[in-house]
Amino acid sequence: MNEKVKRILTGVKKYLIESFGDKIRQVILYGSYARGDYNRDSDIDILIVVSDDANPIEVEEFLSDLLFEILLNENELCSVRAIPEKLFKKYNSPFLLNVKEEGVMV
């Protein structure tokens, strides 16, 4: 993972924690940047695990302005999904298995 992506991820996590506090349980990078096989067209895939009393859709929508700024200022597209902690721990869909196996904690 390159330094620009590390800086972006650190900023996203800080922004989330400042806004949602302990409702943010984990921020995980997954996909090509986590695997190290990214190219210039790759997006930055981020999974946010939230407490069960948080609204994942609200977290995703909250980030939309920041993600747009990242696109404009850094020329990096970020794709964000949020999921309640209970579902993240309980289910092993192909997507979640991939994140659990290849994901990198931020």
PLM regions: where:
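Short beta-strand->loop micro-motif that forms the acidic, two-metal-ion catalytic signature
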Residues: D45-V49
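Catalytic core of pol beta-like nucleotidyltransferases
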Residues: M1-R25, R35-G36, R40, S51-V106
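Basic/aromatic recognition patch in beta-strand/loop cores that engages polyanionic ligands
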Residues: S32
